[in-house]
C-alpha cells in the first residue's frame, strides 16, 4: 500500500500514550509515541497533554510518510478511550476522581454505570473512598449536569475545561441545537468570559471555518477592540493601529479591504462607533462616555444662584470652632462653590492636601438644607468606602452595593452623592453612577489626578478636568501634623519628578539602601556574566531584607485574626511591587511571604500558581458574579445563596477549603460577604495577596506598606507608579532596594496618555458647540 496515496482516507488507531516528544503551546501541535513505539502527530487543544500519558486513547486520522521522521499517524481527533463518560465524570461531576472513574468504568460498561447513577446510586458505596457524604455530592452533581454530557464530549477534545463547559451550557441554555450552532459559528463562544478569540479561532479553524468568513472577521473586530480598550485603558482606537492588530490576530497581511467592508457593516449595526475621523470605539464605551458629556452639559445649565448660607464667612467661622479645624483658602473656595449654588464639584488634590477635611466641610454645609440620611458617600472598594465614612462621619457604601440596592429605581434616593477615589473609576462604572443621579442631586467628585488612571477603559477624571465639565477646585497645600511625617511630602516631590529627601529620619518613612557598590562603575566595568551574578546576589539581599521587615508584623497579624478583626488584619501590612515575575515580583514574593505568615500544615489546595491554605490572605482578580452568602447566613449553615458581583481588587481571607465539594470559601469582611470558589476557578479568579502589584492596590490604604525597588523593574519605574505606591501607606512606608533605581524612578515622568471617546468628541469643542 502506498501510504502517500491515502491522504483522503480516514483511519482509526488506538493505543496507550507512552510519551510526549514535542508540544508547541502556540500551534497546539504535538508529536508523541504510543506504547508500541508508533509515532503520532497532530493538534491537541488541551495544553496539558502530558496529563493523559499512560491513558488508552483513540485516534482518527491518516497515515503519512514524513521525510525526516518516517511513517507517522497524523490524527484529526484524539480522545480517551472512555472519552465521553470518563471526561464527564472527572471534569464535570463533583466527587469523582480520575482514579475512581477508571475503577468504575473498569467494573461497569457505560450503559450500566449510567443506569446505576440514575436509578441505584447506593451501589457505588461498595467502592473504596465513596461514603454517604461523597455519594450525595456525586448524585446531586450528576442530576444537575447529566445533560451536559453531549456538549462535554464535543468540547473536550478542544481542551475546554469543565468550568467553561458549565458556563457555556448555562449561557446558551435557551439555544436549541447548541452543538450545531457552535460548529456553524464557534465565535459565539467568545461571549463566555475567559474564552478569547484565540481559543475560539482554534476550534473554528479545526472545524474547517473559512479564514475570510464575515463572522470570523467581525468576531475578531469585536474582541480585539474590546481587549485593546480593557488592557490599555483607551476607549477608542486609531484605524491604522486597529487594522494592524487585526492582521496579527487573523494571520493576514494587510487585509484592509476585508476590514473596511466588515467595519461598515458593524457601524451600521451600531456595534462599533466612529468617534472622529478614523477613530473607533466599541458601542458600550461610546455610549457611556457620550452620556457622561451630556450629563455634565445638562447640569451646567441648571446651576442655581441661590446661596445655601447668606452670611458664609460667619457660618465658616462658627463651623471651624465647632468642628475643631481651620480651612485653608483653597479649601474654603471648595465649600464656597457649593454654597453659591453649584450642583456639581470636582474636588481635586494630591496626597496630604486635605481632601477628606474639605469633603467633610462641604457635607456639613449641605446638611443645612438636607437631612443626614439624604447624604451618601461612595467609593469603588470596601476599604476606600470605610475610610471616607471614618473621615467625614457620613454613611458610605461601595459603588456596586449602591447600584445593586437601587437597580429597580430610576434614581438614587439621595440629595447629595459624594464619589471618592474618582481616579479609580472607569468609564462604564462612572456612567452607571451618573445615570442614577437626578438633576437636583448635588454631585461631588473627589480624586487625585496624580495617581494611576482607572483599571479598565477610560480616563474620566482627567478628561473632566481637562475640559472643565464642571466647577473644579484644586488643592495644592500639603498638611503635616509634624516635621517627622513625610509620606505626603515625599510622594508629592516624586509626583513632580523630583528626588525627595529620602535619607532623613522620619516616623512614617524609611529607605533601606541595599545597593550594588558603585553601581554604574560595576555595570560598565564588568562583563555581562559577572554583572548578572552581582545583580542576582544583590536581589537575594533585597529579598532577605524584605522578609526580615515583614516578619516584624507577623505577631500583630496573628493577634488581629485571632480577635476576628479580619478587616484590620488584611490592611495592617502590604508589600507592593511593580511586576509579577522575578525574584522580587508578586508571584515569588507571595510564595515567600506565605511561608512567613501562614505556616499551617493542614491540607491545602495546589494550583498552577500557588498552594492555597486555610487563613491565607487573598485577592479577587476579575469582576465576576459569584455564589455568595452574608456572614450571618454562612455561620447559620443556610442553604440559600445569592449571586453577587465581586470586584477586581477585593481583599479576603480563606476561611474554609472543602475537599468534598471542591470549594474554597473566602470571607470579604468589608462587604460582610462569604464567596464560594470552585477549585478549578482559583487561578482565574483568585490570587494570594501578601504581595500585590501597584495597580492592584489603587484606592486601597494600608497601615504599613513596603515597596521593593530595583533596576530589574526598570521598565515599570515612573513617577505615577511610585507616587501611587507610596501613598497607599497610612502610618509607615518602607522602601527597600537600590538607591540609584529609586532616584531614577523619581525622575522618570510618565508621559503615556490614554485615548478616550470624551477626548475625541471634545478636543475641538471646548464649549460643547
Which residues does each predicted region cover?
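Helicase C-terminal subdomain and adjacent C-terminal extension
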Residues: 1, 704, 710-769
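OB-fold nucleic-acid-binding modules
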Residues: 1-9
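Accessory alpha-helical DNA-binding modules that contact the DNA backbone or grooves
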Residues: 8, 29-33, 41, 52-57, ...
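Conserved nucleotide-binding/hydrolysis modules and their immediate coupling elements
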Residues: 13-21, 25-64, 426, 591-723, ...
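Pre-P-loop entry segment of helicase/translocase ATPase cores
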Residues: 156, 218, 222, 226-231, ...
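ASCE P-loop NTPase helicase motor core
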Residues: 332-510
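Conserved helicase motor core of P-loop NTPases
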Residues: 333-337, 342, 355, 362, ...
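Short glycine-/polar-rich loops that comprise or flank the Walker A/P-loop
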Residues: 373, 414, 439-442, 468-473, ...
Amino acid at each position: 500500500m502506498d501510504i502517500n496515496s491515502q491522504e483522503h482516507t480516514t483511519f482509526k488507531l488506538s493505543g496507550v500514550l507512552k510519551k510526549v516528544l514535542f508540544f508547541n503551546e502556540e500551534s497546539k501541535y504535538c508529536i508523541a509515541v504510543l506504547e508500541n513505539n508508533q509515532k503520532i502527530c497532530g493538534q491537541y487543544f488541551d495544553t496539558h497533554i502530558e496529563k493523559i500519558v499512560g491513558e488508552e486513547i483513540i485516534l482518527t486520522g491518516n497515515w503519512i510518510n514524513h521525510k525526516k521522521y518516517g511513517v507517522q499517524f497524523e490524527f484529526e481527533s484524539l480522545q480517551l478511550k472512555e472519552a465521553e463518560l470518563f471526561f464527564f465524570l472527572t471534569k464535570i461531576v463533583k466527587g469523582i476522581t480520575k482514579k475512581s472513574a477508571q475503577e468504575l468504568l473498569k467494573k461497569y460498561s457505560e450503559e450500566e454505570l449510567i443506569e446505576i447513577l440514575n436509578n441505584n446510586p447506593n451501589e457505588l458505596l461498595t467502592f473504596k473512598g465513596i461514603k454517604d457524604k461523597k455519594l450525595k455530592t456525586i448524585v446531586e452533581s450528576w442530576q444537575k449536569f447529566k445533560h451536559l454530557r453531549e456538549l462535554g464530549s464535543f468540547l473536550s477534545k478542544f481542551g475546554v475545561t469543565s468550568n467553561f463547559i458549565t458556563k457555556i451550557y448555562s449561557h446558551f441554555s435557551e439555544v436549541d441545537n447548541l452543538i450545531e450552532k457552535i460548529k456553524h459559528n464557534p465565535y459565539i463562544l467568545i461571549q463566555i468570559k475567559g474564552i478569547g478569540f484565540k481559543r475560539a479561532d482554534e476550534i473554528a479553524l479545526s472545524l474547517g471555518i473559512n479564514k475570510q468568513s464575515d463572522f470570523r472577521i467581525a468576531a475578531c473586530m469585536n474582541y480585539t477592540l474590546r481587549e485593546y480598550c480593557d488592557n490599555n485603558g483607551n476607549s477608542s482606537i486609531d484605524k491604522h493601529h486597529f487594522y494592524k492588530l487585526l492582521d496579527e490576530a487573523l494571520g493576514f497581511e494587510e487585509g484592509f479591504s476585508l476590514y473596511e467592508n466588515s467595519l461598515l457593516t458593524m457601524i451600521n449595526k451600531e456595534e462599533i462607533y466612529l468617534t472622529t475621523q478614523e477613530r473607533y470605539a466599541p458601542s458600550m464605551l461610546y455610549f457611556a462616555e457620550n452620556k457622561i458629556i451630556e450629563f455634565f452639559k445638562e447640569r451646567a445649565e441648571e446651576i442655581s444662584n441661590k446661596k445655601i448660607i447668606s452670611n458664609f464667612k460667619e457660618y465658616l467661622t462658627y463651623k471651624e470652632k465647632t468642628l475643631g479645624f481651620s480651612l485653608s483658602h483653597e479649601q474654603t473656595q471648595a465649600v464656597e462653590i457649593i454654597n453659591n449654588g453649584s450642583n456639581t464639584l470636582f474636588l481635586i488634590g494630591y496626597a496630604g492636601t486635605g481632601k477628606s477635611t474639605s469633603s467633610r466641610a462641604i457635607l456639613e454645609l449641605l446638611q443645612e438644607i438636607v437631612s443626614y440620611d439624604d447624604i451618601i458617600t461612595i467609593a469603588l472598594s470596601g476599604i476606600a468606602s470605610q475610610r471616607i465614612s471614618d473621615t467625614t462621619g457620613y454613611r458610605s457604601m461601595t459603588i456596586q452595593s449602591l447600584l445593586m440596592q437601587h437597580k429597580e429605581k430610576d434614581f438614587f434616593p439621595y440629595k447629595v452623592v459624594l464619589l471618592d477615589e474618582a481616579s479609580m473609576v472607569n468609564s462604564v462604572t462612572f456612567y452607571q453612577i451618573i445615570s442614577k443621579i437626578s438633576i437636583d442631586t448635588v454631585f461631588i467628585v473627589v480624586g487625585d489626578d496624580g495617581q494611576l488612571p482607572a483599571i479598565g477603559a477610560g480616563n474620566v477624571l482627567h478628561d473632566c478636568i481637562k475640559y472643565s465639565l464642571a466647577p473644579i477646585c484644586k488643592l495644592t497645600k500639603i498638611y503635616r501634623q509634624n516635621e517627622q511625617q513625610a509620606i505626603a511630602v515625599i510622594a508629592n516631590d516624586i509626583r513632580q519628578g523630583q528626588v525627595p529627601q529620602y535619607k532623613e529620619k522620619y516616623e512614617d518613612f524609611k529607605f533601606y539602601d541595599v545597593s550594588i557598590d558603585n553601581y554604574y562603575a560595576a555595570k560598565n566595568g564588568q562583563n555581562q556574566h559577572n554583572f548578572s551574578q552581582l545583580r542576582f546576589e544583590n536581589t537575594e539581599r533585597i529579598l532577605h531584607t524584605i522578609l526580615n521587615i515583614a516578619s516584624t508584623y507577623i505577631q500583630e497579624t496573628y493577634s488581629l485574626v485571632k480577635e476576628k478583626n479580619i478587616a484590620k488584619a488584611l490592611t495592617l501590612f502590604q508589600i507592593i511591587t511593580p511586576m509579577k515575575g522575578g525574584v522580587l515580583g508578586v508571584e515569588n514574593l507571595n510564595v515567600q511571604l506565605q511561608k512567613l505568615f501562614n505556616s499551617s500544615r493542614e491540607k491545602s489546595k495546589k494550583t498552577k500558581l500557588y498552594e492555597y491554605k486555610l487563613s491565607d490572605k487573598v485577592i479577587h482578580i476579575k469582576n465576576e458574579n459569584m455564589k455568595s452568602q452574608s456572614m450571618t447566613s454562612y455561620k447559620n449553615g443556610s442553604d440559600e445563596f445569592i449571586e453577587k458581583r465581586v470586584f477586581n481588587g477585593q481583599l479576603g481571607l480563606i476561611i474554609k477549603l472543602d475537599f468534598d465539594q471542591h470549594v474554597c470559601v473566602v470571607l470579604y469582611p468589608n462587604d460582610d460577604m462569604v464567596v464560594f470558589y470552585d477549585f478549578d476557578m482559583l487561578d482565574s479568579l483568585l490570587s494570594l495577596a501578601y504581595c500585590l502589584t501597584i495597580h492592584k492596590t489603587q484606592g486601597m490604604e494600608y497601615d504599613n506598606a513596603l515597596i521593593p525597588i530595583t533596576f530589574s523593574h526598570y521598565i515599570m519605574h515612573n513617577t505615577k507608579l511610585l507616587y501611587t505606591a507610596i501613598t497607599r501607606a497610612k502610618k509607615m512606608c518602607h522602601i527597600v532596594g537600590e538607591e540609584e533605581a529609586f532616584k531614577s524612578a523619581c525622575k522618570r515622568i510618565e508621559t503615556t496618555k490614554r485615548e478616550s471617546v470624551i477626548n475625541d468628541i471634545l478636543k475641538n469643542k471646548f464649549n460643547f458647540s
